[in-house]
Each structure stands twice: as structure tokens, then as C-alpha cells.
């Protein structure tokens, strides 16, 4: 079970818009994901339609949302307002814990489809490694086989949990989205993903600016060499490692900056220098402790009934 060929990174020079190119990661099933996506975590219902529309106008062709972000309908409105052809957009959502379980997950995907205004999704992830992940996964397998979802995966699954999901399911996860940034580089997790043919996505690529990420002198010095910002250096570092990055901004000029990273490459020595920044520690919290379970039980209660 769960045996298939590994994903492979590919370079695609098709233009998003004049002067912009993008690189892709090809999943085990052949589906290609743009290496830069627009993340909408913590973007309000009021701002989401404008932000998504502006991101698409800027050139993003990959949008990442989640049921627990409570902005799927507004993301759908932004997509509609942009006028983009649905086939030209890679759209991801994630299943929240309270929607786990076979029937619950099937129903929740149907709700997400309606909110997003689409009849299919490019990628659906299990958002957290808790509760009935196996029932939820079998629902995603069914929807994948039915053609409702083009690719399926997980988020925040540590190496042992990912190995378990790969080994004991008919269809192995194609993606694992985890916190990845210069201070928490996920080296061991990455090795495990590559071994098992799972592509990596990075949430919080800037660590939400904590620990003075944007003024880090090492990253700033590298940026000066290339005429790029610290944010652009981080995103290039991720994409050169064939990791899909999901930056977020509500400002159009920052959206443009975050997308404009494929016109330079970091040298091997620069990549090695950045590797030296790794603390091997989450900038937020771990997901594999009893306290983490308690935290997410609290989140489920807190978010119950919200739309």
C-alpha cells in the first residue's frame, strides 16, 4: 500500500503575465503545483475578496485556503471577481478536525466546493494530525478517485505520522504542508518526504516576522548581493529546494515582490550559509505532545459553529 514513484520538480517557463515565469513541483500522480502560492490565513472576510483578486491580477495562479480560515466563500468571490478561467488556477483547501470522519469529510468537501464556487479542487489536505484521520483520508481517496479532487495530502504530519499514512492507505499522501523557514528548516522531515515521494509545502515561510526574520543580517547581506529583499531570498531558498512556498500579504506591492523571485538563483555557498541558520525548533508550537492535543481540542471548541 502507498507505493508509487516520487514527485519530481519541473521548470515551466509559461508566462503568468508578461515578464513573469514560474517553477512547478510535479506530484507523484503528475499534477503540477506552482512553487509560489498565495496564502490567506488570517485574512479577514472583508479583505479576502480584494486580496485574492489582486493576487490573481498580480500573477498568482495558486491559492491556498482552509475550512478553519473561515474565508472560503470570500476566496471564491475573489476568484470570481478576477475573471480567471478556473482551469488556470491551482486551488487548495484543508479539512478541519471537526469535519474528520468518512461521512463528515465528504459533506465538508461539498460545502467547501459550494463556498469556493467550483466543482473540483486541485488539492485537499487534512489540516491537522488528530482525531479520525483515517476516516477522513478514505473520504479524500474516494473523492480523488471520483475526480472531484486532483491531488490529496496532509498538513502538520510529522515524519512518523506521515510514514504511517503512506504505509497503511491505498493512496499515499502526495503533499505534506509544514512550517518551514530559515530558522526551522525541517531537514529530517524533508528527507522523510523525499524518501516517500511526498512533496513539501511551507506554511509561515517568514515565521510571521518573529525573531526579527525580516532584518536577519545574514539574509539581508545575501539579498544585497542580488538586489533582493529578505523575503525574496527566503522564498528563493525554499523554491530552490523544490519546496512550495505560501507567502501572505494584504498589500499588492508585497504580493508582486513575493512573486518576483524566479529571475535569480542563490549560489551553493549562499544556500549553505542559510542552512547554518537552522535552530531545528518550531517558531510556534509542536504537534506531537499531549499539550498540543489539548490545544487543538480547545481550537475545535472555540471554532464550533463559526462560518
Model-predicted segments: where are they?
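N-terminal binding-site loop/beta-alpha segment at the start of enzyme catalytic domains
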Residues: 4-89, 206, 302-307
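Beta/alpha (TIM)-barrel catalytic core signal, keyed to glycine-rich beta->alpha loops juxtaposed to Asp/Glu
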Residues: 24, 128-307
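Short, acidic/polar
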Residues: 43-55, 101-116, 160-163
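Acidic-and-aromatic substrate-binding clefts and catalytic sites of carbohydrate-active enzymes
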Residues: 43-46, 65-74, 98-103, 129-134, ...
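A structural motif
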Residues: 60, 118-121, 149, 173
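Short, well-ordered amphipathic alpha-helices
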Residues: 73-80, 109-113, 140-141, 162
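A short, structured active-site edge motif that brings together acidic residues
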Residues: 86-99, 122-129, 156
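CE4/NodB-like, metal-dependent polysaccharide N-deacetylase domain
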Residues: 105-125, 142-146
Amino acid at each position: 500500500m502507498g507505493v508509487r514513484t516520487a514527485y519530481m520538480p519541473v521548470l515551466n517557463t509559461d508566462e503568468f503575465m508578461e515578464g513573469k515565469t514560474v517553477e512547478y513541483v510535479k506530484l507523484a500522480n503528475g499534477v503540477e503545483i506552482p512553487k509560489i502560492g498565495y496564502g490567506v490565513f488570517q485574512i479577514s472576510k472583508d479583505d479576502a475578496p480584494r486580496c485574492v483578486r489582486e493576487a490573481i491580477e498580480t500573477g498568482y495562479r495558486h491559492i491556498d485556503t482552509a475550512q478553519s480560515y473561515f474565508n472560503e466563500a470570500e476566496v471564491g468571490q475573489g476568484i470570481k471577481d478576477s475573471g480567471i478561467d478556473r482551469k488556470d488556477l491551482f486551488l487548495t483547501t484543508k479539512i478541519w478536525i471537526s469535519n474528520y470522519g468518512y461521512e463528515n469529510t465528504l459533506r465538508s468537501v461539498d460545502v467547501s466546493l459550494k463556498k469556493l464556487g467550483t466543482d473540483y479542487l486541485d488539492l485537499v489536505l487534512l489540516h491537522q494530525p488528530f482525531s479520525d484521520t483515517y476516516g477522513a483520508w478514505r473520504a479524500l481517496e474516494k473523492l480523488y478517485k471520483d475526480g472531484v479532487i486532483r491531488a490529496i495530502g496532509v498538513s502538520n504530519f510529522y515524519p512518523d505520522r506521515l510514514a504511517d499514512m503512506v504505509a497503511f492507505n491505498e493512496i499515499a499522501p502526495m503533499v505534506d504542508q509544514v512550517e518551514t523557514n530559515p530558522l526551522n528548516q525541517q531537514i529530517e522531515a524533508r528527507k522523510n518526504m523525499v524518501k516517500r515521494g511526498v512533496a513539501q509545502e511551507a506554511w509561515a515561510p517568514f515565521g510571521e516576522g518573529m525573531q526579527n526574520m525580516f532584518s536577519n543580517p545574514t539574509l539581508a547581506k545575501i539579498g544585497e548581493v542580488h538586489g533582493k529583499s529578505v523575503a525574496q531570498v527566503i522564498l528563493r531558498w525554499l523554491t530552490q529546494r523544490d519546496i512550495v512556498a505560501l507567502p501572505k500579504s494584504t498589500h499588492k506591492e508585497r504580493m508582486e515582490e513575493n512573486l518576483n523571485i524566479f529571475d535569480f538563483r542563490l549560489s551553493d555557498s549562499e544556500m549553505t550559509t542559510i542552512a547554518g541558520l537552522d535552530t531545528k525548533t518550531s517558531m510556534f508550537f509542536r504537534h506531537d505532545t499531549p499539550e498540543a492535543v489539548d490545544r487543538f481540542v480547545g481550537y475545535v471548541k472555540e471554532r464550533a459553529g463559526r462560518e
